[in-house]
C-alpha cells in the first residue's frame, strides 16, 4: 500500500465510529477513520444507510444529519452508483455469494480502485478479482 492508496468503508464501520453502541468497536472504527483520512471512499448508499440508522438509533436531529452529510462530502470521496457499478454488482452476485447490498458496495469499491474494503458483513480476507481485499476491522 502507498500513500495514494484508497480504502472503501462500509456503513457498519461508520456506524460504530459515530455511535457509542459498542465501545471497543467504536474505538477501532474511529482510529481507522482517523488513520485513513482523506483516502477513504464510500458510496451514496453508505451515506444513506448511516443517516437512516443514526436517525433511528441515536435520534439525531435533521440539522445534525445535514452537518454529517456535509462533513462526508467535504472530507472524503463519496462515489455515485452508476450503471456500470450496478452491472458489475449483478455479475458479483452471479459469481460469488454476495447479498444485493454487499455486491453494490464491493462493485463500487472495485470501480473506485480501492485496495481494501473494510466491512464487518463480508468474508474477512477474501480477495475479489485479485484487486480488492475485504477486511473485517473488528475481527481479532
Each language-model region and where it sits:
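Conserved glycosyltransferase catalytic-site signature
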Residues: 11, 83, 102-103
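Acidic, PIN/NYN-like endoribonuclease modules and their adjacent C-terminal/linker elements
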Residues: 1-2, 107-140
